[in-house]
Swiss-Prot record:
This is Putative thioredoxin reductase. Homodimer. It comes from Methanocaldococcus jannaschii (strain ATCC 43067 / DSM 2661 / JAL-1 / JCM 10045 / NBRC 100440) (Methanococcus jannaschii). Keywords: Cytoplasm, Disulfide bond, FAD, Flavoprotein, NADP, Oxidoreductase, Redox-active center. It is an enzyme of class 1 (oxidoreductase).
Length: 301
């Protein structure tokens, strides 16, 4: 079988593309590595998506998934490891199968950026990248957030009403937020401490993470806590595009034009994976734009 389009990733952008594909009567398939709905499920309260004055991230993710299922978008849970673009139709190779398609929408999003110290051995044992996933393990306990700007601010906001104390460690002289209201919320919290100009040196602990060694103006000290959340932002999920011929920028994000087209005719990228502003509203718009252009493209074949 040759699909009209294959959508790689079932976040807001991918599912929007899928909805438009099904409404356009395309033979579409969506392939998702983890959970349909995307990384928005990890968010706390979402207040900037039109139509919902206030909604929890996981609830919004579920609504996206349900909407796509209403239009019977087929979603297969598998990991895409390679796409072959030299011949038509394109070939999408997963861990468990191979698929042929006339067009592709890449909506693989991003993943947490690592600290680059010794944190890997403590993941699940005091180290986490997801406040919404793991915050309640630290009810009335002390936690550390290591990060910068909006990611660190969001994590601290998610934790401040759960943890006894939140210590934000940043290597910057100030924190900047994508929306000033977020910074206001953080400053209003009386259980949040911010340590500026602090360079993390090492995660300390034996069986589990117990704190972090930092250097502030050349002076080293150890900050103790029950848990540590790393919030340094995200990097694109584009490793599988190696040797695909699809152009990436120096940070690994997919290069596209204003219509979400890549340098290869028939292949599009939507949402966070193409960089720029990383917001649900933008990803949804990208999904709409990409699939509208794919429908036009297919009509000309």
């Amino acid at each position: 079988m040759i699909h009209d389009t294959i959508i790689i990733g079932a976040g807001p952008g991918g599912l929007t593309a899928g909805i438009y594909a099904m409404r356009g009567k395309l033979n579409a398939l969506c392939i998702e590595k983890e959970n349909a709905g995307g990384r928005i499920a990890e968010a706390g309260i979402v207040e900037n998506y039109p139509g919902f004055e206030e909604i929890r991230g996981y609830e919004l993710a579920e609504k996206f998934k349900n909407h796509a299922e209403k239009f019977k978008l087929p979603i297969i849970y598998d990991e895409v490891i390679k796409i072959e673009t030299k011949e038509r139709p394109f070939k999408v190779i997963t861990k468990n199968s191979e698929y042929l398609t006339k067009t592709i929408v890449i909506a693989t999003g991003t993943k947490p950026k690592k600290l680059g110290l010794n944190e890997d051995k403590f993941i699940g044992r005091g180290i986490s990248y997801c406040t919404m996933c793991d915050a309640f393990f630290y009810l009335n306990k002390e936690v550390i957030v290591i990060g910068r700007d909006t990611p660190a601010i969001m994590s601290a906001i998610n934790l401040k009403d759960i943890a006894k104390k939140v210590i934000v460690i940043t290597d910057k002289s100030e924190l900047k937020a994508a929306e000033s209201i977020m910074l206001d919320k953080l400053k209003e919290a009386n259980n949040v401490e911010i340590i500026y100009n602090a360079k993390p040196l090492e995660i300390v602990g034996e069986e589990r993470a117990e704190g972090v060694k930092i250097s502030v103006n050349g002076k080293e000290e150890i900050i103790k806590a029950d848990g540590i959340f790393i919030s340094l932002g995200h990097v694109p999920n584009t490793e599988f595009l190696k040797d695909s011929g699809i152009e990436l920028d120096k940070k690994g994000f997919i290069k596209t034009d204003e219509n979400c087209r890549t340098n290869i005719d028939g292949i599009y990228a939507v949402g966070d994976v193409r960089g720029g502003v990383m917001q649900v509203a933008k990803a949804v718009g990208d999904g709409c734009v990409a699939m509208a252009n794919i429908i036009k493209y297919l009509q000309k074949l």
